């Protein structure tokens, strides 16, 4: 035996010797003789490889030279045998071996280098060597050119990114240090590279140290700040990265610093001086960030459709081997850079806090092992021995030496300078003192707790709060404060995770991993543990008896087989998801069920019973005992993961769609599963069971579930008629459980539970688990469950989930939230959701229900409301309310159509206005408009780009979409000046405080501003988490008093914004003012608290933020249905930024203080509302004072709060409201009252800022809102689709998918009809047209309109002449920056001659592809009106106005203005005389009555027919009390109801005008083709606004027609429209959209010769109109009035006797 062992040992020894000989024979041959220490280091780094020394003298850095020789050998082996090779930064020796020698292995070779002084000298030296002299002649010629810096076929000298040699592979031997990733990406694109193998030095210390000398590995480096001048970087372009792409890898704080320095004339960059240890030769200077990027960046995206995957393959000392490959874009790459191997740590330097000179470093980097030894030594010594520091210094000096025992190093030496040793010892002594103090405090607190009355754990929690990392917990001593704990501690260096996609600064520490619990799969090991008493197996529960099936229903299975197409449609509908993995899973499932033939399934088994009864556990135990392979199918991923923890191989668990492919594969391989278990089976359709049987016919199918829990839900709406599993229960062999082990006793004992499971018992040890808590109750240890997605979103901060998502899961404690909404009431009535909600817990159930509905449902008690002040008997009825009945009625359906984009655009232009000469995508002015303040712009850089940009669109002249592009500097500058040079109108301080007090009182009536500690802690935690997730670091946070923190970067949004009318005037874009991270971080937590209060703190106000439009519509509808006799006001703001003044600032500051915001943070917010500077890179800057910024963290919240405060204060009777930014929706019962006097700014808001719509259907954030339904606005969708331009086919396809998602439900006949009629009602056009437009949108969502069929248009083309005429050549050449001062009378110098007479060049005539521009320069005055802008087609007042030729002469303009004033005065005088004559013929009482009636009629408060001029459709109208004045003498000014009645004095108007008169009187009717009324009168009755705005709720008085009056009015109509002889009587039945009380009347287009009528006809028509307005409601009572009427009729043309019909 011993001899055999000896032989074996001899064989192994011989093999080792042979292997060592092979290694020695193939050793790396060095051309120099390395020192012994360097050779040993190389052997250790590359073990087991060997090195052979040469005969040349050693270099000054032998270890680094050895790395270089190894890299050359590896790269040359990689390049051999390849046809083409590209080498980056080649040496002549390397090129000779690969290509220059006579027998070189590479036929086609190219070297890319960037010629410099160092490389040039080395090439000259190599050219004189013997090895190069032996090369081929053509190679020697190319080498000579390279030595002189001249490019050749073999070598280029401009860098790897500037060459186009084609090769798939490349090599780089320590030559990538100054090649940025951008340049390398260009090289991959230009050369066609797919892989580059490279070597480079990467010292680990570069990650955390600036100065290193590593004698062991033979290198040293020093990080410096290298100064650079502005001329080196050409900063006038405004972007450093344009010339220095290596700066891409600096963080934001460094970037801001560099840009500030660059603006002053110089900046610095971080550079690294690298050389060998003890090397006197030339050192290398590399860019720090470029070098470090190769270590930290793993996946670098490029603009060429691919990314660079950078992988570190090997690391030997400082040398690393890289493999850089071309990879598909978008994948996330992770890598770990270990720093723990060095055993280093940072400790705070106490000398730093005491030194005033600034020479000390903040921390000391030293050995973690030595620090631990010092700390352990201090803890074992009494305090008095450590006071004089002598003992500590002696112990520390003893640790400097290495300890070697038996040639083995048991303790390494400590390389530390004497100065650092002193500082380390002193710093550790201070840390030791603090730690001892903490221990004393902890012990004292524990003693007090043990012998006191307080809880030990509660006290210890507060004492150790900050030490354990818990937030917002303060100890009883200063040593436990967060400041002390963070500052005075040892920071161990952790590993760095490289998760870099765009910036390598996004690095973090590895999270701590909790080791998983041990799982035993070995039965023998289990037996051993069981015998040893270490493992106790739970007893197998008893199995209930089997109930045999009751018959077999063949028809049911036939219907199941027929539902297979519906199931396929459900899977296909799910393919619209953006989750890549889910999409792949669904595609595989579709492939699996292709070609299946379903047959009836016999022999089904079912395990059913109450929740927690052990159904699944019993089945698992039975199957394991029987053996065999089972597949467990779960409906959700969470249930599948829970199942994985319970089963053992070879059984497996899968989700429902993945399981299908597993079954087919197992059957095809001949190893099918013996049993298939479908858990929570009632959540599946029955066709799934048939599919499982078809895929695995031999498998036994067992169903597990509870018929009383939540069943199958058709989320896609494609399988409404499919049979369910509950239909097949009686055909299964059933095992019914009736004892639960999880549910507590009080849950099982409820009437509700016993009604579902009669006689059910429980074995749970929990007796009392149910608690009814307050609505604001929070518990971080409990899982919050909600009934609807709405409530889940409201309580997202609690980690809430829906009851449906929680089915099948178990929690220790549960908070069941219920708010009493309509949707929740419906789910509660279905019982299944309530059952799941009350059976998910094992210990505690906290019911958060302020309505008491859940308690009544659990005890089966009826809900009753007792009115104590009404003496009437209590009656309970089950009849549904009338609103519910009306909502379920079916309206008239419109047959489906096959619309085309051309037809939809035709209808949109017909109904919403057409600008026939609008042949552009974006409209802008070339002149700049300044409203005040100081602005500085860069004229050269602001010159617009005249290069046409092709896009695709559905129409040549885009009508309704405003396009802004952030890359267009002209638009960006125009936006900056137009939006941020305006000023807000501040109130006196005492008036502003009064307004704030009133607005706070209004907000308090709707919101509870109480903030709990949990909510505050959660907001702070989420703010910090979000800040770090976005790459924020402590270095990014500047002090609030930093002067650079006030500089705000301005950016313009790239967007396409829809408008309901054609855009034919200059438009500016929307800007983003990007505040610093410091400012946003200070207030971010408190803003989160305010947003949470807005979402959840009110039951009468909805904060519409964060939900899709479909969900928002359902939530609004549920709230509106609770308001009886709902009436609406929809409001939007104009110039919302300027509406914010000091009142808005004081209001928001007051709310911040109310929720507990620190005073310093509130003061910082107030300061940020003051003066600041907005800077647009390369364009200019604007000084802003008081104006609102759109990029601050508080802006969205502040906008909503301010809008809500104003609207809730000015309007009375609000029962429900919804707000989102400047959009408002108010809902009242019967009426809403407006009172502008409640705020000092009320009148200004009414006349200038507020746009209000008062009607039965109002718009709100893309929705149409009525008392019955809330639906999406299909017209706005159509305007967006057919009015926008599309830049690429990819973006077009994404837009199609988005439209498909929102139009899923539009195919439903009832909803389609609803959309048609509501859209037709609101926009006043035929429902057939609405149906056509809706069907066109649906077809777009289906993808019926390919991208290739769209027209090619030119987006935003500026006319060259406009710029040249605006900015003369001498001005543009001499004046680079022009400063705009506040508005002055005189123009700035240099612009007077040009700007005095702005000319419109001939090239500005509107044509396809060219935008409308006006040529003027902002000199502090408003721009001139453009004379060539065509008016809107439906604008009646503009059509009646004669076209006035443009002139630049101010005298002509003044003369025309004087003529206009004289004409208006004469008109007023004649009108007054005529009114006095009419009034003198009436009795005084009748005079007052008729005057009052006429005023009310014209203001729209009394009902009746009134003639209005048709105008272009507008979605809203303003609060303005003045009529809109035309630019010339028109009839519209006299006949429009918006004009102020001449008979009304100021006193009478103030006495008779109701609350809504200011904006009711400014509305004009629309031109409609044919008014339409749906057949359901019960639902759509009383559509026009009621006169109940004043509080009157009665019916309208009936108005009689007068034949003579009808004849006069018909004369007026005939005079205005000769082709129209009568008004259709059907118009009186129309369902017309009105604003205020103006009626809609149908009119065709006006005649072209109407403007040519003489003055007599105009006077007669005007007089007839006045008489008609006086007589429509009141018959002529006197003969004098009749005589006047006859006199008027005699002066007009003959009029046929035709009756006039009134609108509804």
From Swiss-Prot:
Pfam families: RdRP_2 (PF00978), Viral_helicase1 (PF01443), Vmethyltransf (PF01660). Residues 1475-1501 have a biased composition (Basic and acidic residues). One of its GO terms (cellular component) is host cell cytoplasm. CDD domains: Alphatetraviridae_RdRp (cd23258). Gene3D superfamilies: P-loop containing nucleotide triphosphate hydrolases. GO terms for molecular function: ATP binding; ATP hydrolysis activity; mRNA methyltransferase activity; RNA binding; RNA helicase activity; RNA-directed RNA polymerase activity. Residues 1505-1518 have a biased composition (Low complexity). Residues 52-295 form the Alphavirus-like MT domain. It is found in: Host cytoplasm. Its EC number is 2.1.1.-, 2.7.7.48, 3.6.4.13. Belongs to the ssRNA positive-strand viruses RNA-directed RNA polymerase family. This is Methyltransferase/helicase/RNA-directed RNA polymerase. The lineage of its organism: Viruses, Riboviria, Orthornavirae, Kitrinoviricota, Alsuviricetes.
